């Protein structure tokens, strides 16, 4: 009867009641946990797959915007993007299908033969036609028997137009396997817990302290920077709510940390890829941040800048102090790289806390080298125009004054003076006409009217005209027999060749000889015209300048021969407007060669027979 008494004891009843409560509670918790875990795992799984799809969507959209649609390069880039996800365990296969339902790329090696073939899939058609995502479950065999697969389709859009579909097969069966394993573990754990509870009832309090222990462990992990772990929730009591709140706190801290890191990376990316140079210092003026553009403009390595005094890096330590920079926010021009000739506009700003404490300085270097060059060229251009107009005007004024003073009555001097005045007037007219033409080209108002012509006939016609006019010059031609067609403005290109040929004849000496060589490159559909003279040549340090406006190698001789200094500059503008190039090679004392490259089409015999 002792055992019956023991059975009826409060201790036993408490143990029995506790065991019954444990059994009921574990069943409820188990069901809730299993359902919640299943939903969480499935949601997380689908969220991950959806995230992969969105990442691919953004990257594929970028590929289509950067490259010609349907090009080989675009297809290869898309394949490379898909390959980045090929080895992910949860991915069965990813395909990219264009708007015509043609498979452009796939991660599955065994299905590479399906590339460029049309696929008939209802979910793909739905995604392409409606422009909306869709998903469904299917059974599929990946070599280890049939398993559940979650298929997800997301349309890819460029400028609101659907250009394709990302088709993803994901191994969701692994999630169910994981749930089964967890259920088995849970069942085993329940049995062990019941066994231990019956024998060691006095350890019941441990069920209360366990969540607290978990939270303590999670706190330790958070202090180490690990925010991914979560406290297991055993119930809905105050401790469970505390665990849930703790998990939410951990999640928010993780999100805040991720946002901070994201903003830091974004800021680093912006600073790195800025077109302006950035130097950021601490409160003592030591450089702590220098982007690539700043290093490039300064012509210095990173180790020669970071940690050094900013004003010393900018060679301003003898001109300014940090206090002066703080008081004066005006920008100024600075020659920061004499070797490269880089001129920058430097703006300084001070980083100040709300309390007024200075924490650092920022220098923004804006490259104005090109602007300064343009301004310098503008001033030179105005000076050259003024000089070119002043010279003939001064000459004309002198002759007119002489005529007013009575020279008009001299039958020998008067005609000579009038002739010089007329020549100077004509030179000014030519100069003004050339300036007007250059102005039209600069403003793109000088229209280029292209037409397809027989270039062989075109160049021979120009040479024949000059050959008939210049009896004292020998013209040598080396022009291919094949017909070369070029799409050019005949009037404009005639002006170019007339200018080059006139210069060649003008500066040739002795037995004047002008050679013409035309070579074609069928591979690139380009031709090169070379016009060579046996003239006085050009010094090697001046060859590249002859296409500059108003540049003359010998100013006195050029004016004497009636040149304005704008002919080759106009020729360069015309050639470049034809997608061509013009340059010169010269040996002083031996002659000069002018090279002109232009697009062309070479017609072989029989090409017109088709």
Swiss-Prot record:
It is found in: Cell membrane. Keywords: ATP-binding, Cell membrane, Kinase, Membrane, Nucleotide-binding, Phosphoprotein, Transferase, Transmembrane, Transmembrane helix, Two-component regulatory system. Residues 206-258 form the HAMP domain. The chain crosses the membrane at residues 14-34, 185-205. It catalyses: ATP + protein L-histidine = ADP + protein N-phospho-L-histidine. PROSITE patterns: HAMP, HIS_KIN, PAC, PAS. ATPase activity is inhibited by derivatives of thiazolidinone, benzamide and furan in vitro. It is a multi-pass membrane protein. GO terms for cellular component: plasma membrane. Its main location: membrane. Residues 384-602 form the Histidine kinase domain. Autophosphorylated. Pfam families: Cache_WalK, HAMP, HATPase_c, HisKA, PAS. GO terms for biological process: osmosensory signaling via phosphorelay pathway; regulation of DNA-templated transcription. It is an enzyme of class 2 (transferase). Its EC number is 2.7.13.3. The keyword Cell membrane applies. The modification Phosphohistidine is found at residue 387. SMART domains: HAMP, HATPase_c, HisKA, PAS. GO terms for molecular function: ATP binding; phosphorelay response regulator activity; phosphorelay sensor kinase activity; protein kinase activator activity. Signal peptide: none annotated. InterPro entries: HAMP_dom, HATPase_C_sf, His_kinase_dom, HisK_dim/P_dom, HisK_dim/P_sf, Light-responsive_reg, PAS, PAS-assoc_C. Residues 263-334 form the PAS domain. Member of the two-component regulatory system WalK/WalR that regulates genes involved in autolysis and cell wall metabolism. WalK functions as a sensor protein kinase which is autophosphorylated at a histidine residue and transfers its phosphate group to WalR. This is Sensor protein kinase WalK. It comes from Staphylococcus epidermidis (strain ATCC 12228 / FDA PCI 1200). The gene is walK.
